[in-house]
């Protein structure tokens, strides 16, 4: 029987993964690639968050760093995205009290924004952190709808101690490439998830809804097959550990909540080594449906799965690379007294609006946790549609010396025309019939 604590943490998950990190066997590394290890850790000084660099120095992590064509990397997003972003200059402003987005000409919250609302950031602007956060949030949604089956793996020094398998479907409204035909509940985004394994989790279904306003909390419902009913859940559980693992629902994309939930400020700018698959766009393969496409993802093998691994059991040993990217160093902090995190430091790409790393402090101000958030990019054959997708979170609790991997799916699908009824309370209950 599921405990209530287990149930709440699973609900939070839906508001949603020899060794060195190399490409799969048979895939040569690009010219200029190099290995970062304990033997040359100094090369990454000021290019990794301090807790991560310490683990490289200790021999826990070995990474493959590859050179990057910055312009080609930007072309992971479509030309239309960049043009729309430029056209947005001067169109939007922020509500000073809530950090909510509003159209400058009407003062109203928009229901749809294509491209970055703030294509130029002045770090001296007191609202710059909030503007960076909005660029990040809306870039998350350009893929419109998506789904994948994945695992959550709890890992300590002895290897894997827990594994959960589930699928997650997500539909976006506010920042998608093409505006949705219908949005009957005035949502920014919605997700549905279904737990598949282990047996004590099977049939647990989660529905989340993010309303398009400045002040409301997310709507969360969990359906437990033993109870045969859906139950409302507090959105602050996004900061609770998922099923006792060292990973949190707010780790999706390195931040999964509304922009308005945090107070944001830029505290620096630098270059960072960013975790990606690729680093250039993967292919979106056609299916029988004109609105659905599939993307094959190289598997991110963990150290605990790799014979001869000498680093941390949770390090990624295959198909993950690091690329050097310019980032804003942004501090975020929730004002919700029920939210467990205190100050959170995030490293956000200045161009691509991706959060690659975050360092988390508790409400007493003590650092305890780092999340590494990896992404891949995919495009249609004619380059007219592209998106970015999270493919893994490596969450590491530096107080307990444990970690969790979330994601690491082998395939994903992109759905450009989800039926809204698939994300309803009725659908939530029927999943386990």
Role assignments for model-derived ranges:
Residues 25-218, 224:
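Solvent-exposed N-terminal domain segments of exported/luminal and surface proteins
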Residues 202-205, 216-217, 339-344, 356, ...:
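Short, surface-exposed coil-to-beta transition loops
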Residues 18-24:
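Sec/Tat signal peptide C-region and signal peptidase I cleavage site
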Residues 11-16:
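Hydrophobic helical h-region of N-terminal Sec-dependent signal peptides
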Residues 25-119, 227, 237-317, 324-326, ...:
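Non-transmembrane domains of secretory- and envelope-associated proteins
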Residues 321-322, 326-338, 342-352, 361:
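Extended serine/threonine-enriched, polar tracts that run as long, contiguous segments within proteins
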Residues 1-10:
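Bacterial N-terminal signal peptides that target proteins for export
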Residues 186-192, 218, 323-331, 354-358:
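Short, hydrophobic/aromatic-rich segments at coil-to-beta transitions
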């Amino acid at each position: 029987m599921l405990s209530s604590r287990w149930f709440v943490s699973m609900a939070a998950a839906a508001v949603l993964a020899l060794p060195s990190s190399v490409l799969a066997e048979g895939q040569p590394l690009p010219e200029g690639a190099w290995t970062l290890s304990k033997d040359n850790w100094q090369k990454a000084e000021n290019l990794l968050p301090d807790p991560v660099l310490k683990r490289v120095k200790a021999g826990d992590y070995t990474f493959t760093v590859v050179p990057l064509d910055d312009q080609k990397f930007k072309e992971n997003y479509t030309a239309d995205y960049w043009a729309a972003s430029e056209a947005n200059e001067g169109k939007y402003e922020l509500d000073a009290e809530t950090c909510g987005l509003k159209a400058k000409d009407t003062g109203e919250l928009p229901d749809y924004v294509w491209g970055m609302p703030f294509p130029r950031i002045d770090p001296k602007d007191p609202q710059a952190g909030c503007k960076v956060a909005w660029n990040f949030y809306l870039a998350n949604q350009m893929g419109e709808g998506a789904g994948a089956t994945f695992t959550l793996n709890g890992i300590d020094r002895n290897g894997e101690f827990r594994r959960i398998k589930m699928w997650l479907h997500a539909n976006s409204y506010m920042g998608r490439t093409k505006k949705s035909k219908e949005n009957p509940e005035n949502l920014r985004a919605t997700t549905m998830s279904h737990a598949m394994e282990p047996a004590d989790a099977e049939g647990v279904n989660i529905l989340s809804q993010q309303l398009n306003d400045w002040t409301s909390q997310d709507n969360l419902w969990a359906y437990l097959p033993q109870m045969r009913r859906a139950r409302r859940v507090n959105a602050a559980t996004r900061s609770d550990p998922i099923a006792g693992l060292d990973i949190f629902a707010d780790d999706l994309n390195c931040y999964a909540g509304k922009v308005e939930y945090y107070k944001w400020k830029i505290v620096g700018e630098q270059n960072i080594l960013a975790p990606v698959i690729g680093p250039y766009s993967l292919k979106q393969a056609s299916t029988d449906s004109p609105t659905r496409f599939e993307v094959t993802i190289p598997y991110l093998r963990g150290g605990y799965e790799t014979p001869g691994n000498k680093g941390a059991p949770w390090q990624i040993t295959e198909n993950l690379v690091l690329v050097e990217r310019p980032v804003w160093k942004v501090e975020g902090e929730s004002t919700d007294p029920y939210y467990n995190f205190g100050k959170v430091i995030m490293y956000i790409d200045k161009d691509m609006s991706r959060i690659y790393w975050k360092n988390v402090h508790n409400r007493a101000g003590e650092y305890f946790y780092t999340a590494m958030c990896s992404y891949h990019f995919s495009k249609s054959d004619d380059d007219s549609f592209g998106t970015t997708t999270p493919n893994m979170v490596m969450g590491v609790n530096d107080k307990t010396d444990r970690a969790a991997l979330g994601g690491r799916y082998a395939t994903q699908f992109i759905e450009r025309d989800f039926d809204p009824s698939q994300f309803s309370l009725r659908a939530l209950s029927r999943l386990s019939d």
